[in-house]
């Protein structure tokens, strides 16, 4: 069996509107016939915890998929540089107050390629429960998958 050297991590919470974007993307990816070296994880709201426990010496590339608010049109997909993450509130701390940006930067500095695929959300409903993505964000799921498949081939 081929070692897993690419880790795709979907972050977010399906109960809070567009925050579930990363979960929706990895749900679709899990049903696809991906190369043997790719591992897909739905980290939910515990992205930092999963990343800290799942990254081992075999991992060469991490692709994080998440809904992020960076003041663009809802549904806009943006590939985010690791250096931009501390400027995004969600990446300063995750739902468990674990700083994710410094951890991703540290992985990057250790030679692991870190790619963050963000989607501009329209409705982040926390603390109010509202399952389901907005129409704009739902339409962006396939575009994100297309970008991720391109990243896998690099």
From Swiss-Prot:
Its EC number is 3.4.23.-. CDD domains: H2MP_F420-Reduc (cd06064). Gene3D superfamilies: HybD-like. It is an enzyme of class 3 (hydrolase). Pfam families: HycI. GO terms for biological process: protein modification process; protein processing. InterPro entries: Pept_A31_F420-red_hyd_d (IPR004411), Pept_HybD-like_dom_sf (IPR023430), Peptidase_A31 (IPR000671). One of its GO terms (molecular function) is enzyme activator activity. SUPFAM superfamilies: HybD-like. The keyword Hydrolase applies. Keywords: Aspartyl protease, Hydrolase, Protease. Belongs to the peptidase A31 family. PANTHER family: HYDROGENASE 1 MATURATION PROTEASE, HYDROGENASE 2 MATURATION PROTEASE. This is Putative hydrogenase maturation protease MJ0253. It comes from Methanocaldococcus jannaschii (strain ATCC 43067 / DSM 2661 / JAL-1 / JCM 10045 / NBRC 100440).
């Amino acid at each position: 069996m081929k070692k897993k050297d690419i880790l795709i991590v979907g972050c977010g919470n399906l109960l809070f509107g567009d925050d579930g974007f990363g979960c929706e993307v990895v749900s679709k990816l899990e049903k696809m016939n991906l190369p043997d070296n790719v591992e897909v994880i739905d980290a939910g709201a515990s992205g930092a915890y999963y990343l800290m426990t799942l990254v081992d010496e075999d991992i060469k590339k991490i692709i994080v998929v998440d809904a992020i608010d960076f003041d663009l049109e809802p549904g806009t997909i943006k590939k985010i540089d690791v250096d931009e993450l501390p400027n995004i509130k969600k990446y300063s701390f995750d739902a468990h107050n674990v700083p994710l940006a410094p951890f991703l930067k540290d992985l990057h500095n250790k030679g692991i390629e870190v790619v963050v695929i963000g989607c501009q959300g329209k409705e982040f409903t926390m603390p109010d429960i509202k399952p389901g993505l907005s129409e704009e964000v739902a339409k962006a799921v396939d575009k994100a998958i297309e970008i991720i498949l391109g990243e896998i081939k690099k």
